[in-house]
UniProtKB/Swiss-Prot annotation:
It comes from Entamoeba histolytica (strain ATCC 30459 / HM-1:IMSS / ABRM). The gene is ICP1. Changing C39S: Increases inhibitory activity towards model target papain. Disruption phenotype: RNAi-mediated knockdown causes an increase in peptidolytic activity. It comes from the Eukaryota. Keywords: Cytoplasm, Disulfide bond, Protease inhibitor, Thiol protease inhibitor. This is Amoebiasin-1. A motif (DE loop) lies at residues 51-61.
């Protein structure tokens, strides 16, 4: 089961070596993208997948698929920020997930 924005500021438990996927909506055509601000005790990959849209339509959004893997036992944490890389702002949206790795 994938995690979504509904899981923001929650804690999950996974086994060492187990993968979990976080799916967050975004639209990089606006200049904003989900970036990993910090990641402790976990490995991660981020991939953007655009939503299907009619030919010739620009500016469609999509979903960011962030895969995390428990690499060390103990408490891990990932913080993602939805921002324009060239203009960080204190009001940028964040997604934080604590992960207990067993």
């Amino acid at each position: 089961m994938s995690l979504t924005e509904d899981n923001n500021n929650t804690t999950i438990t996974i086994a060492k070596g187990e993968n979990k996927e976080i799916i967050l909506h975004g639209n990089p055509t606006t200049g904003y993208s989900w970036v990993v601000d910090s990641c402790e005790g976990l490995s991660n990959t981020v991939e953007y997948v655009a939503d299907q849209h009619a030919p010739g339509i620009c500016g469609c959004g999509g979903k960011y698929h962030i895969k995390i893997t428990g690499t060390q036992t103990g408490e891990g944490k990932i913080v993602l920020v939805y921002r324009r890389p060239w203009a960080p702002n204190a009001n940028d949206r964040t997604f934080t997930l604590k992960v207990n790795v067993q």
